[in-house]
Amino acid sequence: MMTMKGRTVSAALASKKKGEQSNRISPELPTFDTMSILSGSHPEPVAPSGPANLAAPLPRPLDPYRWRPEFPILQRKLDNGKPLVYLDNAASTQHPQRVIDAMSDCYQRYYANVHRGSHTLSGESTLALESARETCARFIGAASTHEVIFAAGTTAAINTVARAWGDWRITANDTILLTIAEHHANIVPWQQLAQRTGCKLEFLPIDDAGEIADDVVEEHLRRTRPKLMALTAVSNVLGTEYPVERWTRLAHQAGATVLIDAAQAAPHQPLDVKAWDADFVVFSGHKLCGPTGIGILYGKRELLEEMPPFLGGGAMIRTVTTEGFTTSELPTKFEAGTPPIVEAIGLAEAMRFVDDVGLDAIHRHEQQLAAAALRGLTPIEGLKIFGPPADRRGGIVSFVVEGGHTLDLAHWLDRRGIAIRDGHHCAMPLHQRLGVSGSCRASFYLYNTLDEVEALCAAVAEFHQRFIAKSRKRNPPSV
Ligand code: PMP
C-alpha cells in the first residue's frame, strides 16, 4: 500500500481538496489545480523549492545493516543454500518493500490511465503521476516540472535527444565530442545521427588510470569546436567520477550544448542539475531502487520548448486535423502515448527512500567499499584492476585475472552466492582501450557491507590460487 505516514493517494487527494498542506515525505501533491490535470492541460506549476535533495544528509555514516531488512530479496538464500551477495548494482539495483508497495497500491486501488479522464480513478492516478514528477524535479534540483520528462530509461532519453535535438541542430559540418569511457547508450545514438547527417564524432582519450585531464578537454574543445559534448558523469566500468560541472562550463565557453549521462551518478551522489548547468541530464530508475521502464530526461526549459518533439501520437498534441497537428506544452510534448504511470509512482518512492538514507552518506559508504575492495584485490597476483584510486571513483571496481576467463571467474563467484557482472558492460571501445575484451565488475550500493567485500576478495583469491597459480606451477611459462 502506498501509505507513507499512513496516507494513501486517495486520502492525499481528499486532504488536498480540503486545502491541507502536504508533508514532505507523503506522496507529494501537485501544486497546480487538480481539475486542469484531469482535463489534460498543464498550467504553469510552481517551481519545486528548496535544495536538490529532499532532506539533509544523515550526519552519521551509513549502516547498511539498518537498511538491508527493507529489501526482501536480500534475505534470499540461493538454491545451494548460500546467502545472496549482490554486487551487480551498476547493472540494476534491488527494491525496498516500500517501492514494491507503492506500485502495488496503485494497481490494487486507484490504477487507471491518466490525463483527460473524467472519473475518480483517472483523477487519482493523474494526481499521483504528477506528484511523482514533482518528487523527481526536487530530487534533481530542476527549476520546474516542465523540465522533467518521463522516458523509458537512459537509453531512450539519449535517443530522444539525438532525434529531437540532434536531427534539428546537427549538420554535416558539426562535431560531437564524447569520451572513450561512454556506455554504448551514449555512443550508438550519435553514430546513428552521424549516419543520418554526416556529422563527425570525436572521443576524449583516458589516461592509464581512466581519467581525463582538464587540458585534454580544453584542447579537444578548442580543436574540434563541438556542437555537442555528451559524457558520462561516472564510468560504468572504471567507476571514475568525471568533473561534469567544470567540464560543462568549459564546453559552454566553447559554444557546445552539453548532455550528461548520469545513469551511474544520480543513484549514488547528490545531483543538482542547476549546479551542473548541463543542457540535458539523463538517468534510469532501475539503478536507483526503482522499477525498470522509466528514467528521467531533464532538459533546460528554453531548449525543450524550442525543440521539435520526437515520438508522435496521443498526449503530445494540442490539436490534430487531417492537415496536421500542433504540439502540447511541456512536459507532455515529449511523452507521446500512455506514460509509465505506475513506474513513475515507484520511482518517486525510490527517490524518497534513497533520500531518507542520504545521498552523501551513500556516496561515502560506496567509496569505503570500493577502497576495501581495492585493498583486498590488489595483493592478488596477476589481477589487473582498472580505474583510479578510491578517492576519485564511485562504488565500481572492474578487474581481470591474467590467465583466467572472466566468465569462469563470474561462475566461480556465483557458486558462492556472489553476483558480479562479466563481459564488456556495453563499453566495447573502452575495453579496447584497456586492451582486454571484457572484465569482471563488482558494483556496490547502500545495502552492501564490508563483509560482502571481504567475501568477494577471498573468493577471487581462491579462484586465482586454485586455477591460475596451481596450473602455473604445473606448466611454468617458458623463458
Ligand atoms: N549509461 C550508463 C553509464 C550506464 O551504466 C547504463 C546502464 N548500464 C546506461 C547508460 C543504459 O541504461 P539503461 O539500460 O537503463 O537505458
Residue ranges and their predicted role:
Residues 2-6, 12-16, 24-479:
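Pyridoxal 5′-phosphate
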